[in-house]
Amino acid sequence: MTQHIVSGGPQVVDSESFSALTNVSRETLDRLLSYEALLRKWQKSINLVSNGSLPELWRRHMLDSAQLVCLVPESARRWIDLGSGGGFPGLVIAILLRERPGFQMHLVESDQRKCVFMREVARVTGAPATVHTVRIEAFAQGAEAGDVVSARALAPLDRLFGWAAPLFGPETIGLFLKGQGLQDELTLARESWIFDAEFSPSQSDPEGSVLKVRGLHGPDGQPHRR
């Protein structure tokens, strides 16, 4: 699949403008539309996303997730998404990378109802995703490192790194969607963590950023467990 994420994300208002911006195939768009339909149905009984974000679902959630795809190498096969909630960004990425040989998304979420929802989306869309109903700390114990580790609006960086570090290997890329206050979070995180970081403006949120992290470890050279 050819994936092009370009500036102008705030112009995305529906599935067609999303498709025009990202250049996804018709088949991929149909799978994302199935995801949208299931989310709107389940949202009536489970708080998967904030109700206020539903009118802008394609920008606030679909595009916000999709922008991560172009930030990782095509060799990435094992992607771990922490605190997946309603499936953002992990399920969107799994749908977008459905045709990549050997790709598998691991969705880590402790809320059982949200996990049931994500499994249903994966079943309907054929997304290569495994849902783990477990706390992040428990999943990280003994788990294989990911090629990519991601999270969206999960926790401040100093705490988030405590969960993510055990899942980092020498080549792991961390992708974290952050809002305002990123610089303050980075300053605090550097008091406890060693890492290389770069960030770029979010394509979906004028006030947001995508943080890309490599080489995450504690000051003793080993991943922390908190």
Swiss-Prot record:
Enzyme class at the top of the EC tree: transferase
Catalytic activity from the UniProt record: guanosine(527) in 16S rRNA + S-adenosyl-L-methionine = N(7)-methylguanosine(527) in 16S rRNA + S-adenosyl-L-homocysteine
Segments of this protein annotated with the region Disordered: 199-226
Compartmental location: Cytoplasm
Signal peptide (residue range): none
A GO cellular component entry from the record: cytosol
Keywords: Cytoplasm, Methyltransferase, rRNA processing, S-adenosyl-L-methionine, Transferase
Physiological role: Specifically methylates the N7 position of guanine in position 527 of 16S rRNA.
Name this polypeptide is given: Ribosomal RNA small subunit methyltransferase G
Organism this protein belongs to: Parvibaculum lavamentivorans (strain DS-1 / DSM 13023 / NCIMB 13966)
